[in-house]
């Protein structure tokens, strides 16, 4: 499948505004905070729902394209570098704190939720989110899980 058809199929899943494919758009996603290595993905997809993520992953699997999940890109590990082009799934739009269960001391959050937002929403219950990287105002829970 050509790149134009791939972009069309991705747009059919998440909408045209949620697919980046122009070089100037992709440059933002060529690396994380580890800037010594850089690779451009073929496309970046910005899903809003789990169903959209599933559909993108199924499409990429069918086409044998690598996928690169990405949080906020604050890691210093180079873990979000595109491999052989590939489709980057940037999860920053899936960013809600869905529930803080103070009684059981846990929260349900989406993968793109920023660490500091979890603490913000837990604070009224006398709780906080313990991981405290220097990037807590930008890094996401999905990136935390992927990196650690």
What role is predicted for each listed range?
Residues 1-33, 62-65:
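N-terminal accessory segments
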Residues 3-7, 115, 138:
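Alpha-helix initiation and N-capping motif
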Residues 10, 36-67, 85, 91-133, ...:
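N-terminal glycine-rich flavin-associated loop
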Residues 26-27, 77-78, 135-142:
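A glycine-rich phosphate-binding loop feature that marks nucleotide/adenosyl-phosphate handling sites
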Residues 33-36, 78-83:
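Short glycine-biased active-site loop of nucleotidyltransferases that positions the nucleotide triphosphate
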Residues 77-80, 87-91:
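Short, acidic (Asp/Glu-rich) active-site segment that either coordinates a divalent metal cofactor
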Residues 148:
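Active-site-proximal helix/loop microenvironment
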């Amino acid at each position: 499948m050509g790149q134009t058809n791939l972009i069309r199929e991705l747009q059919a899943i998440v909408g045209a505004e949620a697919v980046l494919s122009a070089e100037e758009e992709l440059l933002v996603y060529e690396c994380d905070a580890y800037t010594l290595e850089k690779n451009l993905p073929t496309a970046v997809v910005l899903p809003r729902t789990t169903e959209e993520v599933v559909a993108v992953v199924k499409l990429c699997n069918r086409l044998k394209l690598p996928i690169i999940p990405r949080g906020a890109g604050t890691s210093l590990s180079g873990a979000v570098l595109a491999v052989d082009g590939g489709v980057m799934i940037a999860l920053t739009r899936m960013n809600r704190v869905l529930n803080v269960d103070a009684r059981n001391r846990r929260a349900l959050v989406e993968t793109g939720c920023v660490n500091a937002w979890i603490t913000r929403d837990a604070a009224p219950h006398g709780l906080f989110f313990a991981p405290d990287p220097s990037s807590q105002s930008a890094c996401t829970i999905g990136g935390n899980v992927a990196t650690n």
